[in-house]
Design a protein with these regions (language model features):
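Short, Lys/Arg-enriched, disordered terminal segments
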Residues: 1-3, 247-248
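ABC family nucleotide-binding domain
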Residues: 2-217
Length: 249
């Protein structure tokens, strides 16, 4: 089986005045179809730089990045934008929803740039994506009419709507309390059971226990790449939490 993405000896350097910052120092790993991988690291570890490269928002200084069989490291900006819109689904910590746009319209957004998808098909796929995250009853609500957890569900639906080869999640539980975080991880685990490939960036060790594999970055180097032998079930973890009225975050 070929990997969905392959990172080979990736380096990323930034010029800061007279100094050069080595954000990534020769990192290599593969992610295969159907994997749920956590990329962990503290501030300064290089995980945000890595996510920018994985998301085709930045290019490495050297090394190879192959996504779905295609080399990306030498592509021009327009070609990278096309890859982002067709092959990648993004979920951000701050949701990044348009405030004056309904949930379903937010979910439809990635398909607006795909001329091969009709308005009717775009609407149908957005409804299906919202159903997958349990928000079909809120599709006409504006973001300010939704809770933080519901807004993140809309963001996940938006990431699903173009049927990406991989979902890239950046601290997707970072703005949520523990109960809501576990609810969101339940969705990611269910999507993974359905065959979705997920790369989830986090600095929270407890969130990493819900994935099947953890890659740890430190000082721009890959320090660990381990298979999680005891994957925690997010639904069971959620049900084990104290009731909301007794819950002390």
């Amino acid at each position: 089986m070929d990997p969905i993405l392959s990172i080979q000896n990736i380096r990323r350097d930034f010029k800061m005045g007279d100094e050069t910052v080595h954000a990534l120092r020769g990192v290599s790993f593969d992610i295969y179809p159907g994997e749920f991988v956590t990329i962990m690291g503290t501030s300064g570890s290089g995980k945000s730089t890595m996510l920018n490269i994985l998301g085709c928002m930045d290019k490495p200084t050297s090394g190879e990045y192959i996504l779905d069989g295609q080399h990306t490291e030498k592509l021009k900006r327009d070609a990278l934008a096309k890859i982002r819109s067709k092959k990648l689904g993004f979920v951000f910590q701050s949701y990044n929803l348009l405030s004056r746009t309904t949930a379903i319209e937010n979910v439809e957004l990635p398909l607006l740039y795909n001329s091969s998808v009709s308005a009717a098909e775009r609407h149908r796929r957005a409804i299906e994506a919202l159903k997958m995250v349990g928000l079909e009853s809120r599709m006409n609500h504006l973001p300010n009419q939704l809770s933080g957890g519901q807004q993140q569900r809309v963001a996940i639906a938006r990431a699903l709507v173009n049927d990406p080869v991989i979902i890239l999640a950046d601290e997707a539980t970072g703005n949520l309390d523990t109960r809501t975080s576990y609810e969101i991880m339940m969705i990611f685990q269910e999507l993974n059971r359905q065959g979705k490939t997920i790369a989830f960036v986090t600095h929270e060790p407890d969130i990493a226990t819900f994935s099947g594999r953890t890659i740890t970055l430190r000082d721009g180097l890959l320090k660990k790449d381990v298979k999680n032998e005891n994957v925690q079930d997010a639904k069971a973890a959620f049900e084990a939490l104290p009731p909301p009225e007794n819950f002390d975050e």
